[in-house]
């Protein structure tokens, strides 16, 4: 378990309850945050439903939806922790994106374009998104090229941005500005708000932990 301070202005009466590290697993599942390392394939809703059934809890919601093809950090809130939705889910996100272009794009051309897109941009949700399709402004705090292969027309980028930024839309706009097609072929989220990859577990790790708890009364997993 990792301790993170989400609200440093909050206080509690020490006469009631106990520190999080001393709470039983039942209390943690009634008011905890789970970070799942989402695999490629299932939807965020499917993953949450599986986790809810596996853990045997009624209230488990997720936020920061990832498309089925995307991987990485998916936030799940247990029980009373759903009250923290606004605090937990409004933080910046960081992604690693793999793009494939319709023509050869030089590093200089791509880096030059990336430089013009840092800061505030207009970002329209895709038609298939779950939110209302309308123009919205978002901020790209970090946007840089990690690696590229000009011959195969592939580029790997890292992006740190506001919550609610649609990377698929950003990829489309990059293609338009370069006068070519640009396909988002892979997307991985490795940071969301105060959480990073070190805070996450896979569904297999969760399955193993639940088995140890139920069959061997071992909650250390």
Positions of the model-derived regions?
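Non-catalytic RNA-recognition surface used by pseudouridine synthases
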Residues: 1-71, 77-221
């Amino acid at each position: 378990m990792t301790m993170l301070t989400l609200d440093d202005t909050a206080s509690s009466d020490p006469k009631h309850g106990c520190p999080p590290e001393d709470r039983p697993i039942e209390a943690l599942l009634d008011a905890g945050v789970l970070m799942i390392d989402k695999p490629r394939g299932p939807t965020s809703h499917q993953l949450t439903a599986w986790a809810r059934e596996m853990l045997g809890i009624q209230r488990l919601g997720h936020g920061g939806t990832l498309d089925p093809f995307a991987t990485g950090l998916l936030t799940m809130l247990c029980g009373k922790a759903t009250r923290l939705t606004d605090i937990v889910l409004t933080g910046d996100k960081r992604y690693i994106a793999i793009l494939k272009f319709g023509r050869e794009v030089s590093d200089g051309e791509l880096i030059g374009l990336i430089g013009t897109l840092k800061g505030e941009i207009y970002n329209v949700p895709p038609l298939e998104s779950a939110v209302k399709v309308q123009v919205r402004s978002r901020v790209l705090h970090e946007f840089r090229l990690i690696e590229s292969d000009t011959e195969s027309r592939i580029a790997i980028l890292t992006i740190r941005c506001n919550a609610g930024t649609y990377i698929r839309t950003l990829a489309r706009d990059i293609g338009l500005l370069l006068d070519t097609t640009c396909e988002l072929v892979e997307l991985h989220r490795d940071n969301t708000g105060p959480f990073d990859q070190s805070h996450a577990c896979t569904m297999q790790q969760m399955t193993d932990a639940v088995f140890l708890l139920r069959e061997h009364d071992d909650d250390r997993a």
